[in-house]
């Protein structure tokens, strides 16, 4: 009996606990203060957060491998085609995976926004 209890206890540790999606899904609004800190205008924050939710659902290490330009990275899903621009801007040093750091990702998004507005994100995420 003790052996059976030991086996069951071990098995219970190996089975992941079930959680609701809401309990494990991050919230882009957690990055509001950081976005303001790196230079985003507070008037742009609602749209920024809406795009963040659409692009990554708040997962800082989101990576879209299917993107044809070596993927899209991080909160704002920055496209690999922007690597040269981001290197010239001093945001990315070597690898686009550096954009998994939320601060760096929001800086990159701001640099792209200042250059192109919301176009890199299709420009269709205005809050109603």
Where do the PLM segments sit?
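Catalytic and binding regions of secreted/periplasmic enzymes and modules that target cell-wall glycans
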Residues: 24-25, 38, 43-50, 61, ...
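Export/targeting segments at the very N-terminus of extracytoplasmic proteins
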Residues: 2-4, 12-58
């Amino acid at each position: 009996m003790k052996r059976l209890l030991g086996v069951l206890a071990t098995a219970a540790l190996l089975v992941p606990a079930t959680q609701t999606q809401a309990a494990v899904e991050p919230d882009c609004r957690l990055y509001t203060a950081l976005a303001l800190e790196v230079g985003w205008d507070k008037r742009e924050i609602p749209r920024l957060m809406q795009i963040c939710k659409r692009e990554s659902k708040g997962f800082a290490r989101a990576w879209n491998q299917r993107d044809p330009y070596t993927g899209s990275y991080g909160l704002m899903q920055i496209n690999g085609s922007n690597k040269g621009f981001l290197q010239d801007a001093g945001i990315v040093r070597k690898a686009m995976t550096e954009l998994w750091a939320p601060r760096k990702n929001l800086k990159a998004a701001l640099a792209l926004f200042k250059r192109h507005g919301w176009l890199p994100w299709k420009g269709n995420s205005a809050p109603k």
